Curated annotation (Swiss-Prot):
Key words, A-Z: Host cytoplasm, Host mitochondrion
A cellular component annotation (GO) from this entry: host cell mitochondrion
UniProt record similarity statement: Belongs to the rotavirus A NSP6 family.
Cellular localisation: Host cytoplasm; Host mitochondrion
Protein name, as recorded: Non-structural protein 6
One matching Pfam family: Rota_NS6
Keyword NAD among UniProt keywords: no
Source organism (scientific name): Rotavirus A (strain RVA/Human/Indonesia/B37/XXXX/G8P[X]) (RV-A)
Self-association state and partner proteins as the record states: Interacts with NSP2 and NSP5.
Top-level taxon: Viruses
Length: 92
């Protein structure tokens, strides 16, 4: 199996995890969703350091994930101060 074929399931699982966190927003508080999202990002960083290059996400991809999360939160949260606090919490 080549690197692209190995990487595809990893990226698909990542998207499923992030998507499920986003959809929990109706049931959970924004802080709980952000904590779950941060766990996913932490796991990505861990994978980036211990797995073969086929499974590594580069810094730009991790930053894109954070940016998408922040945009998603901004679109769904009408309290701008809470949104800014959340974005600061997610983004290192």
């Amino acid at each position: 199996m080549n690197r692209l074929q190995q990487r595809q399931p990893f990226l698909e699982n990542l998207l499923v995890g992030v998507n499920s966190t986003f959809h929990q927003m109706q049931k959970l508080s924004i802080n709980t969703c952000c904590q779950n999202l941060q766990k996913i990002l932490d796991l990505l960083i861990l994978h980036r350091t211990i797995h073969s290059p086929a499974f590594r996400l580069d810094r730009m991809q991790l930053r894109q994930m954070q940016m998408l999360a922040c945009l998603w939160i901004h679109q769904r949260n009408h309290d701008h101060l809470a949104t800014l606090d959340t974005i600061k919490w997610i983004s290192p």
